[in-house]
Amino acid sequence: MRKPLIAGNWKMNKTDGETKQFINDLKCLDISDNVEACIISPFTSLKTLTEDLRNSNISTGAQNMYYEECGAFTGEVSPNMLKDLGIDYVIIGHSERRTIFKEDDELLNKKIASALKHDIKPILCCGENLEQRESNRHEEVVESQIRLDLKGINEKDIMSKLVIAYEPIWAIGTGKTASSDDAQSMCKFIRNLLSKMYSKDLADSVRIQYGGSVKPENILDIMSKEDIDGALVGGASLEAESFSKLINYGK
């Protein structure tokens, strides 16, 4: 049984003070034990996040990391720095990292291997853009991303650690909408791909999230799908009350 993972990706939002206020507000609200909740903040708030949530049932995550442990890499954050803070998860290959910062699959592959080496669970993001979707290449694109990003990584290394987040880039800020059936179709495709790449046991153990304008109004429909095991949420995770509704979607 895969425990759903509802992760709030704050992106470049919230100061450290605002993070403290969010946590205080969230502690006053109901936090379900039926799902794993995770907050993924900017680097500047990670220390506050891990300290203030230490005795809670909420996991923590970082939005990015470099694959080297130390050195002359100005502006980067290493996996051992994240591990020292007690971070549980790290996002690898978010669509904004791929498009804005031109991160390619070779780099992402190194990041995933490094995260696993340091016992940080990677949330690997994948997804196709509008042109790729309309030319019916969405499965081809996502398969290529996953195969390249996991190249050389063994099944035993990712069992119970890897999370995959499917992001339909074509449905984010384009006026197009992805239905829950669209999401289920791609998440099922990803699970079948993992079964071919590794084994059915591995595929059945991996949690596959959906990340495309998830909000309290649509999460119940999304989470009703067989192969969707959670959500990677953006804007709807920035307010404590909204995030609490997402976590408690089944109530």
From Swiss-Prot:
Q: Name it.
A: Triosephosphate isomerase
Gene behind this protein: tpiA
Q: Active site at which residues?
A: H94, E167
Family indicated by similarity: Belongs to the triosephosphate isomerase family.
Name the job this protein performs: Involved in the gluconeogenesis. Catalyzes stereospecifically the conversion of dihydroxyacetone phosphate (DHAP) to D-glyceraldehyde-3-phosphate (G3P).
- GO biological process, any: glycolytic process
Q: Fetch the HAMAP family from UniProt.
A: TIM_B (MF_00147_B)
What is the phylogenetic placement of the source species in the record? Bacteria, Bacillati, Bacillota, Tissierellia, Tissierellales
UniProt-recorded Gene Ontology molecular function terms: triose-phosphate isomerase activity
Tell me the PROSITE patterns matching this sequence: TIM_1, TIM_2
| Chain positions recorded as substrate binding sites | N9, W10, K11, G173, S213, G234, G235
Q: Where in the cell is it found?
A: Cytoplasm
Show the GO cellular component annotation of the record: cytosol
Q: Assembly and interactions? A: Homodimer.
Query: SUPFAM superfamilies given for it?
Result: Triosephosphate isomerase (TIM)
> Which UniProt keyword terms apply here?
Cytoplasm, Gluconeogenesis, Glycolysis, Isomerase
Q: Which NCBIfam families match?
A: tim
Catalytic reactions of this protein: D-glyceraldehyde 3-phosphate = dihydroxyacetone phosphate
Q: Which InterPro entries match?
A: Aldolase_TIM (IPR013785), TIM_sf (IPR035990), TrioseP_Isoase_bac/euk (IPR022896), Triosephosphate_isomerase (IPR000652), Triosephosphate_isomerase_AS (IPR020861)
Enzyme Commission code: 5.3.1.1
